Curated annotation (Swiss-Prot):
Top-level division of the source organism's lineage: Eukaryota
Tissue: Expressed by the venom duct.
Organism: Conus aulicus
Disulfide bonds: C41-C47, C42-C55
Propeptide residue interval(s): 17-39
Major localisation: secreted
InterPro entries: Conotoxin_a-typ, Conotoxin_a-typ_CS
Protein name according to UniProt: Alpha-conotoxin AuIA
Amino acid sequence: MFTVFLLVVLATTVVSFTSDRASDGRKDAASGLIALTIKGCCSYPPCFATNSDYCG
């Protein structure tokens, strides 16, 4: 019974680890899209005036 418990814990850990690594790529893509959107906003004066704290 203890062996089954260890196998379940190991399987859960492996699935969780690989799922987290897969989602990291999606997070990177989303942050890149947000950065491009903010850069576009910084070059547009009305948007820059409203969101100047995001523009470097």
